[in-house]
Amino acid sequence: MSNSSIEKIDNKYNFKIEYKLINNKELLKSRLSEIPKSSGCYLFKDIDNNLLYIGKSKKLRSRVSSYFNNYSDLTPRLSLMVRQITEIEIIVTDSEYEALNLESNLIKTNKPYFNILLKDDKKYPYLCITWSEKYPRIFITRRRRNRNNLDRYYGPYVDVGLLRRTLFTIKKIFPLRQRPRPVYKDRTCLNYSIGRCPGVCQEVISSDDYKKIMQQVSMIFQGRNDDLEIFLQKKMLQFSNDLDYENAAKIRDQISGLKLLTESQKISIPDSSINRDIFGIVSEKNVASIQIFQMRSGKLIGRIGYSQKLNNEDENHILQKILEEHYMNVEAVEIPSEILIQYNLPKQATIEDWLTELRKKKVKILIPKRNKKHETVEMVLKNAKLELDRILNGIQDNESSIEDLAQILELSEQPKRIEGYDISHIQGSDPVASQVVFIDGIPSKQHYRKYKIKDPNVFVGHSDDFASIYEVIHRRFKKWSRFKKSGGDFSILNDKTNSKLDNELLSDWPDLIMIDGGKGQLNAAIKALNELNLEEEVTICSLAKKNEEIFIPGFTKSLDTDENQKGVLLLRRVRDEAHRFALSFHRDKRSKRMNRSQLSQISGLGPSRIRELLEYFKSIDAIRIASKEDLSKVKGLGKNSVNDIYEYFNEL
């Protein structure tokens, strides 16, 4: 690769840059001057052509150059990203608005690693209705897959418990499809007999009539309970006038159930006849708490909370980022006509235009100073402050736990980054390991890693946790052994303020690693570190489940601790999370193996076809209920294969 090359195709520029240019500021400045000054998007890529980050700017050259001007001004996360950049792709647009729209679409499609603003926040659930299917399903999911455009997602919802209860109640009020696939081949099940299902599996009800029921259900998730109640009242009156008292009674029961459901939906605000979202942000001690309240037809149907470090950014810049990312992840029809915030955003007019284009109707961003709207914003800010207090109290608790752990292990420095390792298998089958990471006492899920155990001595019927731990620790720290052999100075890792420190090293080096297990597991990890000549650099301990005993190198007995000490409780959280993550990975791996095993019994299906099937349908259950038309959409499946798969599952 040359030092730099610019290739222009229409409005797209490819700008390649060698890693060594990062440290040659004069040459780098010259290359960056070739970037256009106009508005557009920039895409950062690494040496393997993986997308690292997608951004937008009104002035591309100055924005891109700002990443390389002064590394000391960058956060550790951004510094780590910049050091991986080997190619910058530029896409020029006619306006800042077009750049925002393009950025949104590119991020949705590519999901770059460094674009996810809220990595540590849990994935909030959505409710999906599969309108693309003959008999639509309704279910809760945390993953918005690229399904058919006809399918509809509602949400996200912060309270999954409430969402589950709501869906359970809806299925009691309305006769809906209860199962992903039929129980019997030629008759209905008990749900049909008791009126819980209209006989979808045997097509007792037509597709059109069933979709009418689903349209009524969808009104609930649009916050249109009152409209639905009026509709049902008219329907009940019509049945009554026709002397069809049985169906009138069914509608009456639906109305009663709907009223109970409506009463359970949080709070009601009389001022809110218009659908609106209300954003509020408060900050303290470099931590911001953001709350989003979703009002639909005067009712609060959803509430979402985020937390974010300020990192020298103003609250309004953080709020703008949150707002942009939030609306990148919702259906266009879920964008309300009004958005209330506490003060102006840096690019407010541009964002209004972008949201209006997405929604196909006017969207207003308002900063109310008085009346009911202002009171609503104040209510959201009050909730954000309560959440911030909870977060700060948690940080304080974590700090005292880390301090106590440092005293227990007699560490010279408090462990900022703690890694936990665990092994999971069933009698040697599908052996896997997990690496979880806690930073400042909080799980950092973007740093989690999964390992498939490759040791040939670990197989079905012969498990060896010691060999597995040895392998994982050896693989994890092998690059550090190379770093030491090449003359790397480990002493700088203890100086967190060293401006010369490579942030990639800093972000990846643990202050403490914890092995789930006793003395044997600890010795296996120590053996790996000894072979890598890293035994002096890595601080390590193990935590045994029996009596929560802590073992450290050089001691045959466990440390004298109280299992309810704050430091021990922190280690237990790390250990339990490592166990959960390893078990989850093991179950997933075992499930995939069993799915492949079942599909391999079908004539003509090789590994590549099986992989295509599972990637398309995601599960064996989805393949089992798929029609021939659905199966034929899978890449590479011929007519004979489609028939073989369909007949295999329909003859079981």
From Swiss-Prot:
A GO MF label: DNA binding
Record-annotated GIY-YIG domain positions: 37-116
Domain UVR: 226-261
PROSITE patterns given in the database record: GIY_YIG (PS50164), UVR (PS50151), UVRC (PS50165)
Localization (cell): Cytoplasm
Keyword field: Cytoplasm, DNA damage, DNA excision, DNA repair, Excision nuclease, SOS response
HAMAP family to which the protein is assigned, alphabetical: UvrC (MF_00203)
Function: The UvrABC repair system catalyzes the recognition and processing of DNA lesions. UvrC both incises the 5' and 3' sides of the lesion. The N-terminal half is responsible for the 3' incision and the C-terminal half is responsible for the 5' incision.
Entry-linked NCBIfam families: PRK00558.1-5 (NF001824), uvrC (TIGR00194)
Protein name: UvrABC system protein C
